[in-house]
Amino acid sequence: MPAFFVTGTDTEIGKTTIAAGLLHAARSAGLSTAAAKPVASGCEPTAQGLRNGDALVLLGQCSLALAYEQVNPLAFAPAIAPHLAAREAGVELSAARLHEAVREVLALQADFTLVEGAGGWRVPLLGRENLSDLARLLALPVVLVVGVRLGCINHALLSAEAILGDGLALAGWVANVVDPATSRLEENLATLAERLPAPCLGRVPRLEEATPAAVAAHLDLRPLGIGL
């Protein structure tokens, strides 16, 4: 069943917003859905334990019955880079450990599964490992979320180069307009479409309420080989 790794050009550029929109689009097409965000920092304490807002959003778009801990097995309170949060908590944040956790979700064989990373492609894990090493272990095609703002062309092209250089397929990309006041917005989008070696799955404008349904209205899953 189709599964994809979702990464972004930076942190705070709407990876979860786009991932939730993709999951909603798949559910609306009658597909079963599952998701994982294997590591998250900036989690809030609750009666059930630490909970991450982004992971909860993804969980809400899963049609399969998943426990929170399956979606987000490693949750840390400090709103800092995951490897630093893990170090403070005395947790070994290895690609192999994350891979084992994600495999549990992939084994459910949902019609459409997304695995969302944290930050960008080279976010550090344990030692010299990065989140890109997890993506390599999973061997999933990648969806790149481009946060459209000043500097996004360079960030997007470098990210795509790194993804392909790691031997993974770039299945598609999404233009998420995080700064609608970006100078020469249309020209920037045209350059991204010309230079990125993958189909664009959609252009998502800055929305007052970026609900999964509202985001899904701007996305197209067909380039991922999913008929709607």
Swiss-Prot record:
InterPro entries: DTB_synth_BioD, P-loop_NTPase. The gene is bioD. It comes from the Bacteria. It is an enzyme of class 6 (ligase). Catalyzes a mechanistically unusual reaction, the ATP-dependent insertion of CO2 between the N7 and N8 nitrogen atoms of 7,8-diaminopelargonic acid (DAPA, also called 7,8-diammoniononanoate) to form a ureido ring. It catalyses: (7R,8S)-7,8-diammoniononanoate + CO2 + ATP = (4R,5S)-dethiobiotin + ADP + phosphate + 3 H(+). GO terms for biological process: biotin biosynthetic process. Pathway: Cofactor biosynthesis; biotin biosynthesis; biotin from 7,8-diaminononanoate: step 1/2. Keywords: ATP-binding, Biotin biosynthesis, Cytoplasm, Ligase, Magnesium, Metal-binding, Nucleotide-binding. Mg(2+) binds at T16, D54, E116. GO terms for molecular function: ATP binding; dethiobiotin synthase activity; magnesium ion binding. The active site is at K37. Homodimer. It holds the Pfam family AAA_26. Belongs to the dethiobiotin synthetase family. It comes from Pseudomonas aeruginosa (strain ATCC 15692 / DSM 22644 / CIP 104116 / JCM 14847 / LMG 12228 / 1C / PRS 101 / PAO1). Substrate binds at S41. Its cofactor is Mg(2+). It is found in: Cytoplasm. ATP binds at E12, I13, G14, K15, T16, T17, D54, E116, G117, A118, G119, P205, R206, L207. Its EC number is 6.3.3.3. This is ATP-dependent dethiobiotin synthetase BioD. Its main location: cytoplasm. GO terms for cellular component: cytosol. Gene3D superfamilies: P-loop containing nucleotide triphosphate hydrolases.
